[in-house]
Amino acid sequence: SLINDIINTYKLAHKDVKILIVVHRTELLDQISATLNKFGIAHGFIQGAREQYLWKRVQVGSIMSLLTDKNYYNVCRQKFDYIIVDEAHHSLADTYIRLFGLFPNAKKLGVTATPWRLNHESFLSLYQYLIVSPQISWFINNNLLSDFDYVSIKQDSEVQRLVDRSEVVSTGDFSNADLDNTFNNQRIRSKLYESYLQFANGRKGIIYAINKCHAAMIAELYSSHGVKAMAIDCDTPRDVRQEMITAFKNGEISVLVNVDIFTEGFDCPDVNFIQLARPTKSLSLYLQQVGRGLRIVEGKEKTIILDNVGLYNYFGLPDAN
């Protein structure tokens, strides 16, 4: 809709417009392409080995492909009027700064549901204005997001004390190695399944794990109890990953245990439980994770959020102002 509005505004002024939409993951590129197709907007791709049609007025490109030696010359020759960045909380990275430098006259629009960074770095060096959407509670009250029930560990629980004592690294978040040493054991993993069995048994959902080993062990645990669960991460081959996602959307898999795959852009509205098994100090990551379960679809009443690592005790409920 936004792209159509931009194109139509230029048409009224009898001008052509060229738009670049930038993403950082293949899954996001495919989802944006599907949305553009739904609105009848012709577009090309700048990503990997895909055939390029640079004459099309709308291009969807991955940030890494845009700056490769192979594409750099052709990209520089384009005269983009607009650069739209999806998941724009990443746009302070050097790669995006470099891309923006190639098109100093282009208008830039960053879109994100989580405009915060752990290092508190400001976005004002890139964007002049911040347009704030309503709070999550508004979207829930207006039936645009799903309502939820939230189940968390207690503030004085053993797991919460372990989280509070976990090592914090220079990024401002917990050390993955320390989290793995502390939480990737049979006793604590069994608590994940126990809470699933009590509050979300039979539901379709996503679990957020610390690392690949943690994800694999959780998937194995759930599978041993008859739950159709599989682990997925960034090293899962793209074709296998797509097969797993399709099987999940079709209901052939009930639970996907992931590592940093479904924090952004993943759209499967009938997900009706989320399980948090990875501690974090990042508010953005917290909201991205629970947000995967808040999409609405006909027949969906509520999402169950199982917080097994006490993120509620850091951030409150997802719909808090």
How would you label these PLM feature ranges?
Residues 64-65, 234-320:
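Conserved RecA-like P-loop NTPase helicase motor core
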Residues 2-5, 10-11, 15-38, 95, ...:
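Conserved Walker A/P-loop ATP-binding site and its immediately adjacent core
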Residues 1-6, 208, 232, 257:
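Walker A/P-loop
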Residues 89-151:
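Post-DEXD/H (motif II) to motif III coupling segment of the RecA-like Helicase ATP-binding lobe
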Residues 130-206:
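Conserved interdomain linker/interface between the two RecA-like ATPase lobes of SF2 helicase motors
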Residues 17-29, 178-225:
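Conserved strand-helix element at the start of the C-terminal RecA-like helicase core
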Residues 30, 44-55, 71, 216-220, ...:
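Conserved helicase ATPase core of P-loop NTP-dependent helicases/translocases
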Residues 48-82, 93-98:
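Conserved helix/coil segment N-terminal to the catalytic DExD/H
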